[in-house]
A protein has these predicted regions:
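Amphipathic alpha-helical dimerization/coiled-coil segments
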Residues: 1-6, 23, 82-112
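Accessory beta->alpha helical hairpin/"wing" motif in late/C-terminal subdomains of nucleic-acid enzymes
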Residues: 77-81
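Glycine-centered, phosphate/nucleic-acid-interacting loop/turn motifs that mediate DNA/RNA or nucleotide
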Residues: 58
Length: 112
């Protein structure tokens, strides 16, 4: 018996906000905290919790510094984060393919 594709989804990556953070971080070398917060419609506290989960899992790196006199926090995808994101996408594609196959099978089985 084969495993259902849903079993391959990573709970750390798959959560909506964390998947969004990883996806946006994949688009740029590094992304600023405020940009993530605005684009994912998050509170600073909620975003910080998700960043901590991803950082603890080794999927992102967090860099704090200054831009002029303003404190900034930047997020970057680590190589492990890139692999985890790609693995998650592959599992989602498997899940979609299974749904498509089931839909086609059901259409064939419908009485005419």
């Amino acid at each position: 018996m084969t495993n259902h594709p849903a079993n391959g989804l990573d709970d750390v990556v798959h959560q909506r906000v964390r998947l969004g953070i990883l996806t946006i971080a994949h688009e740029a070398r590094r992304v600023e905290f405020g940009y993530l917060r605005t684009n994912l419609d998050l509170t600073a506290g909620n975003q910080s919790q998700h960043l901590t989960v991803l950082d603890n899992a080794g999927l992102i790196s967090i860099e704090k510094g200054y831009e002029g006199k303003r404190a900034r926090t930047w997020v970057s995808l680590t190589p492990a984060g890139n692999t985890a994101l790609r693995d998650e996408i592959a599992q989602l594609k498997r899940l979609i393919n299974q749904i498509d196959r089931n839909d086609k099978r059901r259409k064939r089985e419908q009485p005419t």
